[in-house]
Regions:
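Basic, polyanion-binding surface patches
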Residues: 1-193
Length: 193
């Protein structure tokens, strides 16, 4: 599993999110782990790298993020479609065995007290940048990226490899009500002469 995981330089971490994927948000606090799906996340800044993600007040993950001051974003693949949907439509508050029922496999990265979801194509460890007004009014959380990794079968040398990789590595893009798209064809602009 970890044979293909490599660190991504922090100055390139924004590239893990610029194509607009659905993400899995994970956090840990007081020995409790949780993972939820989020469709609204994006890169925010380059140096230091920052991201945003919307985490609703009713989610159990939000309490873990606020309690620990840390969260991880990960980019799930098309193989993880059902997992992503299940993690996004069930709550730890009402289903304490949510992660086990979803068969979510978690792993650890040394130096980070966070749960990371196995099988994703990218992972970003984030330290919460407290912005109480944004969090309370808009459910908008800002994180400073303190570590980033990718599965080199999908992202290497600072670039996504979707056009070369097995289609199973494509990222998910949530529309609504269990409807997703997978990232499509790569297009490159030809400079005008």
């Amino acid at each position: 599993m970890t044979d293909y995981i490599d660190s991504v330089p922090l100055e390139k971490a924004y590239r893990l999110l610029t194509h607009g994927p659905t993400v899995l948000v994970s956090s840990r606090h007081n020995g409790v782990d949780n993972v939820m799906a989020a469709a609204w996340s994006c890169a925010l800044d380059f140096a230091p790298p920052k991201v945003t993600v919307v985490i609703d007040k009713i989610t159990a993950t939000r309490a873990l993020v606020e309690g620990s001051g840390m969260f991880a974003l990960q980019v799930p693949t098309v193989v993880q479609l059902q997992l992503t949907e299940q993690l996004g439509t069930t709550s730890l508050a009402t289903e304490p065995d949510k992660l086990q029922r979803a068969q979510a496999e978690l792993f650890h990265i040394d130096g980070y007290d966070l749960p990371f979801v196995t099988g994703c194509s990218a992972w970003l460890a984030c330290r919460l940048v407290p912005e109480p007004h944004n969090q309370q009014t808009y459910d908008l959380f800002i994180g400073e990226v303190v570590g980033a990794w990718s599965d080199t079968r999908a992202f290497k040398d600072g670039h996504w490899q979707f056009e070369y990789a097995d289609p199973a590595w494509r990222s998910l893009h949530h529309v609504a009500g269990g409807h997703f798209y997978a990232i499509g064809e790569a297009l490159t602009v030809t400079p005008e002469k």
